[in-house]
Amino acid sequence: MKTIIIDNQELEVDSAMTLLQACEVASIEVPRFCYHERLSIAGNCRMCLVEVVGGPPKPTASCAMQVRDLRPGPNGEPPMVKTKSEMVKKAREGVMEFLLINHPLDCPICDQGGECDLQDQAMAYGVDFSRFREAKRATEDLNLGPLVETHMTRCISCTRCVRFTTEVAGITQMGQTGRGEDAEITSYLGETLNSNLQGNIIDLCPVGALTSKPYSFTARPWELKKTETIDVMDAMGSAIRVDTKGREVMRILPINHDAVNEEWISDKTRFVWDGLRRQRLDRPYLRENGKLRESTWPEALQLAKSKLQGGKVFGLAGDLASVESIFALKQLIVELNGGFECRLDGAKLPNDFRGAYAGTAVIEDLDEAEHIMIIGSNPRDEAPVLNARIRKAWAGGANIELVGPASDLTYDYEHVGKNRAALTKLLKRPLNNKIKDKKSVIVVGIGAINEEDGYGVLSLISEIADSSDSKILIMHTAASRVGAMDIGFVHDGDWIEAVKNSDVVYNLGADEINIEAGPFVIYQGSHGDCGAHRADLILPSASYTEESGLFVNLEGRVQLAHRANFAPGDAKENWAILRALSNELDKKLPYDNLTELREALFGKFDHLFHAVRP
């Protein structure tokens, strides 16, 4: 620790901190464009200049100078830094004037307007005149693909996008060429970006040079209602903000959550909102003479009642269902003496104790891991944000091993093999220097445990974990899976045979399976997907942004999602549909609202009470 004085405020900070970080500890605002706490230091925008008393005669870039480099005063007094002196004020005005020399006056038509760092800092630290009389520089826009829109005349060369794609996303397709006035950000050889994290450069760009192509010219930020909630496109449970205008979702942005997604989200999460408007089920349908026709809720519920009474019933829980809706379905099917299952990906995960399906590691363990073993998973595709964590560990010196098909994971790894023999080899090998006395995490993909011998493979992995003192992280691919297993939504025998032998299958949003001809299928879901095409009766429900609910992510973290907008047409919340159906069946579920449902849920599974808000 070292004592320094910033603007006459004395404080003790870690000597490894930069001056900018020390200013943040002292709650002193220092403007910046190129600096970002999750990227390497570039020091090229010069907006964060401060005065070091007794130091260099010129202002110093606070993002690049560490506290340990400060010299004490002539009499041994603590080093002194000024952020509001006349020297600093003039330096910032000069830097801002240079930044605006070639910047176009696009603010009225720029998508970044209203949330632009350049606008805010020009108002706070700039001047109200320009001495530049020459023609502004013109640059050609880049084609980075269908997701990221470019307006390169607005670029201020902060290089955040270059550093993110190189350091976090792990691709080398962007860089800076030229010097001085000829410097420009470009993609090498005119390539489009090949990353499922590329949308994050839109958030990182401090100006309007990189914007969202699907969102372009659709709304202004002050027109949008902002709701903090949880992503369900994978099992990580990333914290997100859903921005809505009226009844429509306009965009999805990440929220900083160090323990889960840091401040990144995958492109699937970011751009899925356009699918919330298409192929929506907005009214009940029933099948007559092989064709679906529009129906009404009373007619649909009566038909469901007639089919559910007296027949064998089996319930399926899809990937996006909340814990409350699965709990309500379970209670209803128990009343009907039926069965149910949530492991529709075929994962051989025992339900005996929570560690068997929720693992023993948390996502943050990857940050400190010195050895990571990936078994039967491609995290780059299955959970891109988690893959970025593994890459960060690799960049910090962690050793990575892979058992499974080799692929480009954006980091180096030792390919041990791709079958069960490779696991046996790992179990029999002596604890070498790669693992011995090191923090180790085993990432287990569903691909490793969804075959016939899945239980045996999982047992083998557990033996490897025990012998190497490793933690296990199960790479679930469905947001609903851990929560459903928490409440016991599993079948003891072969659920595929149970579905075939059922008279009625109640499908709660499961679009990832094919149900063979035979049973009467009731599909409760939000989109006209595979499940709706097979259904004999469709009950339209809300999507994940249209209802509040609990989700449990792959590490077992209980999270609370909030409703951002309302469902279209006659679609209802999932739990409310099941409650209404139970009333028709004279097997009334004991709750009339979501609060009462949660009280019943927490009464049986009290660990779900401690939900973490996004």
What residue ranges belong to the model's regions?
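Acidic, glycine-enriched active-site microenvironments
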Residues: 5, 48, 63
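Short, glycine-/polar-rich solvent-exposed loops and beta-turns at beta-strand/coil boundaries
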Residues: 35-44, 66, 179
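Structured interaction patches on ligand/partner-binding surfaces of diverse proteins
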Residues: 63-72
